[in-house]
Amino acid sequence: MSNPQQLRYSKEHEWLSGAEDGVSTVGITEHAANALGDVVFVQLPEVGDSVTAGETCGELESTKSVSDLYSPVSGEITEVNEDVVNDPSLVNSAPFEGGWLFKVRITDEPADLLSADEYTAFAGA
């Protein structure tokens, strides 16, 4: 399992892209997607919602369990990926590409985000 080097990671197993015009893309890691099993339902925040780093902002339901989705940063939701709402299996098949979850205009970024190498060591992935 390979964690892209250009991303940063949370200990709740979300990834965060580098900000473009202050907006970053968020998804869950391949490690988290594999642990969940087949994702069958995705509940995302709505455009315009405020999210807080480390707080619940949605839900992922799989054939194994229901898991909370956490925001790795604080900010305002600017876009949600309707493709994963309509086809939740994208979370499993392409967690770092088409399976991204939402975009957020960052107002605060915690200092404890991990590099790819740090996340790999943390997750044992």
From Swiss-Prot:
Binds 1 lipoyl cofactor covalently. Pfam families: GCV_H. Residues 23-105 form the Lipoyl-binding domain. The modification N6-lipoyllysine is found at K64. InterPro entries: 2-oxoA_DH_lipoyl-BS (IPR003016), Biotin_lipoyl (IPR000089), GCV_H (IPR002930), GCV_H/Fam206 (IPR033753), GCV_H_sub (IPR017453), Single_hybrid_motif (IPR011053). One of its GO terms (cellular component) is glycine cleavage complex. Its cofactor is (R)-lipoate. Keywords: Lipoyl. GO terms for biological process: glycine decarboxylation via glycine cleavage system. The glycine cleavage system is composed of four proteins: P, T, L and H. The glycine cleavage system catalyzes the degradation of glycine. The H protein shuttles the methylamine group of glycine from the P protein to the T protein. Belongs to the GcvH family. PANTHER family: GLYCINE CLEAVAGE SYSTEM H PROTEIN, GLYCINE CLEAVAGE SYSTEM H PROTEIN-RELATED. This is Glycine cleavage system H protein. It comes from Streptomyces coelicolor (strain ATCC BAA-471 / A3(2) / M145). The lineage of its organism: Bacteria, Bacillati, Actinomycetota, Actinomycetes, Kitasatosporales.
